[in-house]
């Protein structure tokens, strides 16, 4: 029996599965075959929810006596766009000059391929693992993230599963393998403000109520002053206005409605609830500011809606998990990785409620881009890091 010890072969098999979210595309099946070669038992639960596609997931475990390590990630990928723009077909896993091209090469089929190879090498060298390893893999990370990791964790917990630590194989390194381990993430909160006015002719503003004046005032209150100056482990919270819309194609008509959407990435100064309260307080004060609405005595009429559920800020403090991974990275790459909380959200935000979690994978420079690609040397390097981590984690 040949174990899946080669990360290049593993990744090629996964890339050739067109698992554009929410499609499974054969990727979970390919992964399950690799894991069963190593004696893993596997389940493929499908989860559903209103107004979202059904999603197939995979939970596989190889049990032993000792701590339980979870590797988590996703096999779904973003669409490739126009395939004619690619140097190599996005689902062909072609190699040129020591580089493999394909959608998901770094985000994050590459990380999965390397961890599979690392486990296989450990088993080949040492036999059984001194503990348990599980793979918690979803097909719903690039999509709404409703029927994926969050439900798979609860499904596993209800069946008696518990974990001592988790690694998420997202591409954490900005420039080169070994740059960065993510030990936490900022929270994320999104909302939409709607201001209602009265439509009218631009030449007769006294007969109308321009909602643009109101939306500008409200948005300004969220942009200044700054929410905070950052903390010891997190950069300053940052709010970005992502859309301002009036739906008006005529230049001589005052619109009857204006909307603005925003997203804020926040640090551990705030909880989602305290941040929502701060935003509401700012908007309420600004609604009474009529400097841009001369002659108007009534407050700005607006509605605030929160979009999707917020993700909460977290920071992992587990010394064994972080220390062992840091030492493994340094041993293979020769450099000490930065411990960071930068970047966007990931499914680690769900895992943190079940066990300590960190993120470490490949270099993310080409994720979601045309010609997404990974150096074969990085696949081997990451596999060696994971293999060393597994050996040291289980002692």
Swiss-Prot record:
GO-annotated molecular function: acetylornithine deacetylase activity; cobalt ion binding; succinyl-diaminopimelate desuccinylase activity; zinc ion binding
Any GO BP annotation: lysine biosynthetic process via diaminopimelate
Binding annotation for Zn(2+) 2: 107, 142, 368
Listed pathway(s): Amino-acid biosynthesis; L-lysine biosynthesis via DAP pathway; LL-2,6-diaminopimelate from (S)-tetrahydrodipicolinate (succinylase route): step 3/3
Functional summary from the UniProt entry: Catalyzes the hydrolysis of N-succinyl-L,L-diaminopimelic acid (SDAP), forming succinate and LL-2,6-diaminopimelate (DAP), an intermediate involved in the bacterial biosynthesis of lysine and meso-diaminopimelic acid, an essential component of bacterial cell walls.
Species: Brucella abortus (strain 2308)
Protein name: Succinyl-diaminopimelate desuccinylase
Subunit: Homodimer.
Amino acids binding Zn(2+) 1: 74, 107, 170
InterPro entries: ArgE/DapE_CS, Bact_exopeptidase_dim_dom, DapE_proteobac, Peptidase_M20, Peptidase_M20_dimer, Peptidase_M20A
EC category: hydrolase
Catalytic reaction(s) noted: N-succinyl-(2S,6S)-2,6-diaminopimelate + H2O = (2S,6S)-2,6-diaminopimelate + succinate
Cofactor(s) required, per the database record: Zn(2+); Co(2+)
HAMAP family assigned: DapE
UniProt-listed Pfam families: M20_dimer, Peptidase_M20
Cofactor binding comment, as recorded: Binds 2 Zn(2+) or Co(2+) ions per subunit.
